[in-house]
From Swiss-Prot:
The keyword Coiled coil does not apply. It comes from Conus radiatus (Rayed cone). A divalent metal cation binds at E91, E95. Residues 26-64 are annotated as: Disordered. GO terms for molecular function: ion channel regulator activity; metal ion binding; toxin activity. InterPro entries: Conantokin_CS (IPR005918). PROSITE patterns: CONANTOKIN (PS60025). This is Conantokin-R.
Length: 107
């Protein structure tokens, strides 16, 4: 029984020696410092984005998010403004008249 206890302690000591002492396991596979320094050397450095460059801009260089907020505020937070709704209603009425429908005519 004492033999198994000594073997158990011996195996654990050898394992800790291999892992902590040399940094390798058996066949030379690096576990600690060498591989971790290589991995950090290959990591790209973080890019710090400024607030203005992180946002998309339109062709004129204006900030799209700010423009959309202004448009929605002007429309009263509706998907379409009153002008657009009136235009679409007029177009639908013209199409219905062209088709010969007198009242709401859907395909």
């Amino acid at each position: 029984m004492q033999l198994y206890t000594y073997l158990y302690l011996l195996v654990s000591l050898v394992t800790f020696y291999l892992i902590l002492g040399t940094g390798t396991l058996g066949h030379g596979g690096a576990l600690t410092e060498r591989r971790s320094t290589d991995a950090t050397a290959l990591k790209p450095e973080p890019v710090l984005l400024q607030k203005s460059s992180a946002r998309s801009t339109d062709d004129n260089g204006n900030d799209r998010l700010t423009q959309m907020k202004r448009i929605l505020k002007k429309r009263g937070n509706k998907a379409r403004g009153e002008e657009e709704v009136a235009k679409m209603a007029a177009e639908l009425a013209r199409e219905n008249i062209a088709k010969g429908c007198k009242v709401n005519c859907y395909p």
